Amino acid sequence: SLSHEKYYALGSGPARAMAAKIKDGNEEPVEELYKELGYRDSFDSTVLVIENDAVPPPAIVEKVAAACKVDPGKLTVIVTPTSSLAGGLQVVARVLEVAMHKAHALHFPLENIVDGFGSAPLCPPHPNFVKA
């Protein structure tokens, strides 16, 4: 999650696999899952999709860019309110990701998963983000 003062949002996209932090003098992925998987992306630009109805403050953009080791101008931030069609699609599109997280939580060997497919209904947008 991303937070700064009163701003809070969930983020997804390639930036999650690039973000790193220094812990005990060593660089490691920000997200524990990527540390466990031994996976990290590296590129000169990246994208972060944010579930929120407001543009993130500059402090968050700068923090994410620094964690991904990219210039802030090379970080594309896509804001998708959950109450919008794009926001609803972004949530539904993660159905396979949720299944993979569940398999991981159950200690199923992820290297045994060769392919995956998921489907889920796309509900119409709703002005109330909780109901959406």
From Swiss-Prot:
SUPFAM superfamilies: Methenyltetrahydromethanopterin cyclohydrolase (SSF56199)
Superkingdom, natural source: Bacteria
Catalysed reactions, semicolon-separated: 5,10-methenyl-5,6,7,8-tetrahydromethanopterin + H2O = N(5)-formyl-5,6,7,8-tetrahydromethanopterin + H(+)
Kinase among keywords: no
Compartments in which it is found: Cytoplasm
GO biological process terms held by the UniProt record: formaldehyde catabolic process; one-carbon metabolic process
EC number: 3.5.4.27
Pathway this chain belongs to: One-carbon metabolism; formaldehyde degradation; formate from formaldehyde (H(4)MPT route): step 3/5
GO MF term list: methenyltetrahydromethanopterin cyclohydrolase activity
GO CC annotations, alphabetized: cytoplasm
Keyword Lyase carried by entry: no
InterPro entries: METHMP_CycHdrlase
Alphabetic keyword roster: Cytoplasm, Hydrolase, One-carbon metabolism
Sequence similarity: Belongs to the MCH family.
Role according to the record: Catalyzes the hydrolysis of methenyl-H(4)MPT(+) to 5-formyl-H(4)MPT.
Protein name in UniProt: Methenyltetrahydromethanopterin cyclohydrolase
Native source species: Methylomicrobium album (Methylobacter albus)
